[in-house]
């Protein structure tokens, strides 16, 4: 390229990186908003965590297969149209989710199975369309960035999902805490939301309120009384696990109004009233104080969850328009030459027949053992990542006795350190390992396993360190695990070459989201039946297996262009 062409190429290269970064961040706006809406859905419709878990597992698998299918499509389709249309469809699915109760004529109360099924269908549709987010980006970046620079620049690009998730968290946090309707003066709605809370979440409140309790055996069906609901809770004590005790909690209108008055007075004075203070002021147990305060908060913001779909959906629609206006396809589409260092045999012919393209994809992806090893490794990377990301707040509060605020902060730090980890991993790959991303991945998995091992050691000895050290160790795990999360896609793109990069990333992505079978129900089953210590052992074991998988391709070349032209 001459100097003028190089300058123009550089401008378009960075334009493509920035536009696709923003575009993929918008995909997260209408992908992760469901997590923020779940508390509202539980409060208003009594949807259980089990139902959420089933839906989330299905959605994870659907997304993985969608990424694969869209990867195949992305290698044959203009990325500008592929990505912008996909984001538009995701946005429409998000908007439809918020309108579902209106369409079905369902109000506050126990949700019929029909509503859950409709929610599941809309989420599945959304995640089918979500698969059109990453594959076009993987293909474009391999066309615009030479292999020797791809790790660094794509590691920067990979921060897009963390940027999108962080901005969405701020937006949805504001929505859930400030929007919606106040139905706290409606006795009927308060009773319905009380019933929903007691039957889905009260068990944890009772367990956490008293260290002497060994296990909450059962929260019985709430019995309607004149003033509200009477709830019998059966539990055992650590001092005598064989003897089952029963305690009755009264969720009355009088108790609800007393807690609401105490909370409102504290707000007027600019104070945050803790559960212990509420229990003392209102003369009730700590468990009931926590539950009633949560019910008060939820009745003041009913319907806010809908805006967690509507506002991000509208923003994503604008993002889809922006993608259509500013994004272009390969260098050829804007009159620029292809990268010399990444040319393949398919670049030599302007018109390549389907059989030739199919044979090339078969050779570079499906018959390429390195791609299959990377896919297998991705499974273990995602098990470690999702085990911490999805279950972090739960195991930090239940197993490590952290407050919800501190646990949420720990997961946020985990995500932020992940951004730093991705960037550092990309730089190390290019400068230390000459673009061999799989070597960086190996050392990152060693670091992640060591960090989780340290966390497990501190967990077994709670008096050894402070919560700050625990959070720091977990953040270190985030720093290491996000390196492979970003680099595996880069390695797959390089090994398959730019002409099959999206297909390779689609295949690798399937294995990542197949991990939800373990990181979802697998983790929950272990925690319920054997305790959190076995969960941590399992996560460490997954990291060790991941190290061994990466070790098997230590000697692999940086990319597959020599193989493609052989």
Question: PLM ranges: what are they?
Answer:
Residues 32, 60-68, 165-166, 415-423, ...:
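Residue-level signature of mid-helix packing/kink "hotspots" within the transmembrane helices
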Residues 34-38, 368-423, 485, 519-520:
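Extracytoplasmic gate region of multi-pass secondary transporters
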Residues 65-105:
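Conserved MFS/SLC helix-loop-helix module at the cytosolic interface between two early adjacent transmembrane helices
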Residues 76-87, 431-446:
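Cytoplasmic membrane-interface "Motif A"-like loop-to-helix N-cap segments
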Residues 88-112, 446-463:
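C-terminal ends and interior cores of transmembrane alpha-helices
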Residues 93, 107-132, 466-483:
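Hydrophobic core of transmembrane alpha-helices in multi-pass small-molecule transporters
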Residues 122-159:
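Cytoplasmic helix-loop-helix junction between adjacent transmembrane helices
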Residues 155-177, 418, 509-519:
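Glycine-rich segments within core transmembrane alpha-helices of 12-TM secondary carriers
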